[in-house]
Amino acid sequence: MKYIYWSGGLDSTYLLCKTARNTTEEIQPIYIIFPETRSRGAADLEINAQNDLLPLIRAEDGITATILKPIQIKEEEIPHDIEFESAYERMYNEDIISKHYMYRSLGKLAKQYPGIMIGIEAPPPGTRENNIGKTENAITSYGIKIEEDGTLILEENGNKDIYTIFGNMKFCMVHINAIDELNELHEWGYDDLIPLCRTCCTALPQQCGVCSNCEIKMRYGDTFKKYMPKAYVNYQVKQYLRTIEEKYATLYTIFVWGSGHLNSGKFTSNASGQVENFYLSTNTVNKLETWFNLLLDNYPNFDKVNRADYGIE
């Protein structure tokens, strides 16, 4: 039996397909429904993607494994584990822990499903030193070696708490990037799966292009343009706004997440990657919405839109 953490996203879907082509064993996909993804509606969309993808994957040429019905478990239903939770508490202030809520329970679940494969991919070429991603860099910095097949090995002076948190998982895609994934999916004749994968972490019906998950894919240039056309345009607008002021890029992200609307008054948002407080008057909201819509209408000729004409400094 092989275990794969499958969200219905591109990376874990690629991993599921690749594994199912290279084994005759049963494969058990597993998915955790976190309160964070449930509250924003993303969990429902990811489960819908799994439901759409699974029968197609099973029917693809070259699939030799039996892929079982996914186990979809709420985080609060995962049994307590004192050893894991104590290690997690001690290491909570480390960035790899505190900034990624999935590790709060994924390693605990991995004790029930040892060797569960995680579809965290390599970074886009040229965006990180030696093409080593943040996850690989973080794990190895604690004295833990990632073997070729993704198995973690605790070295002599390695951090035992970090190993307790991650040690039952296999990070078997840290040297495979999204271009590699697309190329292999194309070679296998699985192009039909790509548009059905759920990359975005919002509850929007289409990929937003401006959340952290979407932005990783957008950094591949035009690679994902045909698969995520609206997301691609949103990303280009956001990048343009960054050249003016980061504040506008953040407000544009909120605008996209609000389906083309901003709220007036006082509100908080983590659209920039950290929680920030905002206050926007109704007049400012109207100006910003007009500006953002004109940028979308004039894409890619942003220079045709003079923000000063709409009262934007």
Q: Which residues does each PLM region occupy?
A:
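Nucleotide-activated chemistry modules centered on ATP-dependent adenylation/adenylyltransferase
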Residues: M1-E313
